[in-house]
Amino acid sequence: MIGSFLTRGLVMVFGYAYPAYECYKAVEKNKPEMQQLRFWCQYWILVAALTIFERVGDALASWVPLYCEAKLAFFIYLWFPKTRGTTYVYDSFFQPYVAKHENEIDRSLIELRTKAGDLAVIYCRKAVSYGQTRIVEILHFVALQSTPKPKPKEKKQAAAPEEEEQKQPDLKATSQAASSNPQVRLQSKKPQLVTKEPISPKPLSSPRKQQQLQTETKEAKASVSQTKLTTLTPPGPPPPPPPPPPSPTTAAKRNADPAQPSPTEAEEASQTVAALPEPASEIQRASSSKETIMEETLRITRGSLRKARSAGAPR
């Protein structure tokens, strides 16, 4: 048994190369014979059909012993001058079958041509539309890259809490200075008592500001309730008499060192601090005044009831 590689090489030589050379010699003659040209045309028709069915035969019958050798012998049988198997196979098998189904083959070929043309047109249109969409997307992307991007608002929102954090240490420092210096505390309290301006709400951009505003509103409500309680309480003690005029020695000392506070100013500050009403004492006074009023009304009603009972009782 000859190897498959060797048989394939022999098929290429004796089935294609040598017959092609003989066909060339027949065509290039000065007066080619029609029978010889017809013979070689029939041979190449059979070889084309054999190569088509060879793929199926190799897949199904390649395991049969001497399959490759039989294929090589068939190629030689077709063109060998003594056998001339081409005329026999063509006239007895191939030509009658093709003549019987020639009309069907022509119709199927025409249908395939029309379908292939329609498919080619459809795929060309799809390719053109896809190319147009891709070009538009590329141009849009290039335009977006060329235009300057707007600055994000997140930077402003992030800068607002930083400013608040910077302001908070300043407020703490001022509160500490006010607690250490009583004059500054009095000066900071006086405008709050005199001027009560409405607090204008500012636009908020963070939850921290919202919490601060809520706390401020709660404190404002508490201060309003305390002021209402103070209005209900009876008037307090009369204000203290004005301090005597300063002596010339104290005036000279005040002019000598203006940085140090004078004793009269310290006394005034202490008197104003003492005169300021405390919220807890005011609430207690208001509650005690209400209790006394209720007790008096109860006493009056009890006395009137006793008089009515004594008047209505039989003597």
UniProtKB/Swiss-Prot annotation:
<feature type="compositionally biased region" description="Pro residues">
    <location>
        <begin position="234"/>
        <end position="248"/>
    </location>
</feature>
<protein>
    <recommendedName>
        <fullName>HVA22-like protein h</fullName>
    </recommendedName>
</protein>
<feature type="region of interest" description="Disordered">
    <location>
        <begin position="148"/>
        <end position="315"/>
    </location>
</feature>
<dbReference type="Pfam" id="PF03134">
    <property type="entry name" value="TB2_DP1_HVA22"/>
</dbReference>
<dbReference type="InterPro" id="IPR004345">
    <property type="entry name" value="TB2_DP1_HVA22"/>
</dbReference>
<feature type="compositionally biased region" description="Polar residues">
    <location>
        <begin position="173"/>
        <end position="190"/>
    </location>
</feature>
<comment type="similarity">
    <text>Belongs to the DP1 family.</text>
</comment>
